């Protein structure tokens, strides 16, 4: 068996096409969605990531609002930019690119953001709304994973899902999304400290690997016919980017998301979805 590819690039392109029509409809009503980004410092990886977000915006007609500060920016200077975007009616959603320079209180910065403009879906208030099953911007990567599974017809209802990872961006919120009544999956949350991880993986219909541990998920640990999504990012001794899933898993699983090219494009697409949905809510 060779797994079918869960193609995040193609699915993200389809989502962007749908968003283009929704943005055009908003503009006819006099509303232009705007994505703001706050970039502090000159880290090449962060610069590349933010530039990609603004290219995505241009493709669907979302306005770009870019705020860049030097690495020497103070806590007060960054907070001032956050307050400015909170008040700017042209900005319907924004992100603060992490990590911030050493000495900056990231949590304080994130808490200052207007929850309704939280394009990443990771504001403490919005994570709380997710726990309470109340409407709110959803975390981009977990929601992107769900969208990818749905678009390929992978059965989620009643599925046994193992989430490997416990980070705030994926591992923590992913089970909250999967156990909503609209999904009705049964979730086991594991991590690098889990005893006998293989025993859990072998029972899983869907594996979401987001631990940042190279090739943690091995072919012999995967149930034949499972769907396996590789969201982990780490580097080996030579500096090469590695995923959490061993390449041999593709010979056992029925579905697999490549890394890169699987979940990454979906994360960026869901960021745009959050911005457009915020604009639609404000338009009434």
From Swiss-Prot:
Protein's UniProt keywords contain Isomerase: no
Catalytic reaction list: (6R)-5,10-methylene-5,6,7,8-tetrahydrofolate + NADP(+) = (6R)-5,10-methenyltetrahydrofolate + NADPH; (6R)-5,10-methenyltetrahydrofolate + H2O = (6R)-10-formyltetrahydrofolate + H(+)
Pathway noted in the entry: One-carbon metabolism; tetrahydrofolate interconversion
Gene3D superfamilies per the UniProt record, alphabetical: Leucine Dehydrogenase, chain A, domain 1, NAD(P)-binding Rossmann-like Domain
Binding site for NADP(+): 165-167, 192, 233
Assigned GO CC terms: cytosol
InterPro entries, sorted: Aminoacid_DH-like_N_sf, NAD(P)-bd_dom_sf, THF_DH/CycHdrlase, THF_DH/CycHdrlase_cat_dom, THF_DH/CycHdrlase_NAD-bd_dom
The organism's place on the tree of life at top rank: Bacteria
Family: Belongs to the tetrahydrofolate dehydrogenase/cyclohydrolase family.
HAMAP family: THF_DHG_CYH (MF_01576)
Assembly notes: Homodimer.
Function recorded in the entry: Catalyzes the oxidation of 5,10-methylenetetrahydrofolate to 5,10-methenyltetrahydrofolate and then the hydrolysis of 5,10-methenyltetrahydrofolate to 10-formyltetrahydrofolate.
Protein name, as recorded: Bifunctional protein FolD
């Amino acid at each position: 068996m060779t797994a079918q590819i869960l193609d995040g690039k193609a699915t993200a392109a389809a989502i962007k096409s749908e968003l283009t029509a929704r943005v055009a409809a908003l503009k006819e009503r006099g509303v232009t969605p705007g994505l703001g980004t706050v970039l502090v410092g000159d880290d090449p990886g962060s610069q590349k990531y933010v530039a990609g977000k603004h290219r995505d915006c241009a493709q669907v007609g979302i306005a770009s609002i870019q705020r860049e500060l030097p690495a020497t920016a103070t806590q007060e200077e960054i907070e001032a930019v956050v307050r400015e975007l909170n008040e700017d009616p042209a900005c319907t959603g924004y992100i603060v690119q992490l990590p911030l320079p050493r000495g900056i209180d990231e949590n304080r910065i994130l808490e200052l953001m207007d929850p309704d403009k939280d394009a990443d879906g990771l504001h403490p208030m919005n994570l709380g709304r997710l726990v309470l099953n109340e409407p709110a911007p959803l975390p981009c990567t977990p929601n992107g994973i769900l969208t990818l599974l749905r678009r390929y017809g992978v059965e989620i209802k009643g599925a046994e899902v193992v989430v490997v990872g416990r980070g705030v961006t994926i591992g923590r919120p992913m089970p909250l999304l999967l156990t909503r009544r609209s999904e009705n999956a049964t979730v086991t949350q594991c991590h690098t400290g889990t005893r006998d991880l293989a025993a859990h993986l072998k029972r899983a219909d869907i594996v979401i690997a987001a631990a940042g541990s190279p090739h943690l998920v091995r072919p012999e640990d995967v149930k034949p016919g499972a769907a396996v999504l590789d969201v982990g990012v780490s580097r080996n001794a030579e500096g090469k980017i590695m995923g959490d899933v061993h390449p041999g898993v593709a010979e056992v699983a029925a579905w697999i998301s490549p890394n890169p090219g699987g979940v990454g494009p979906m994360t960026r697409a869901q960021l745009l979805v959050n911005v457009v949905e915020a604009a639609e809510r404000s338009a009434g």
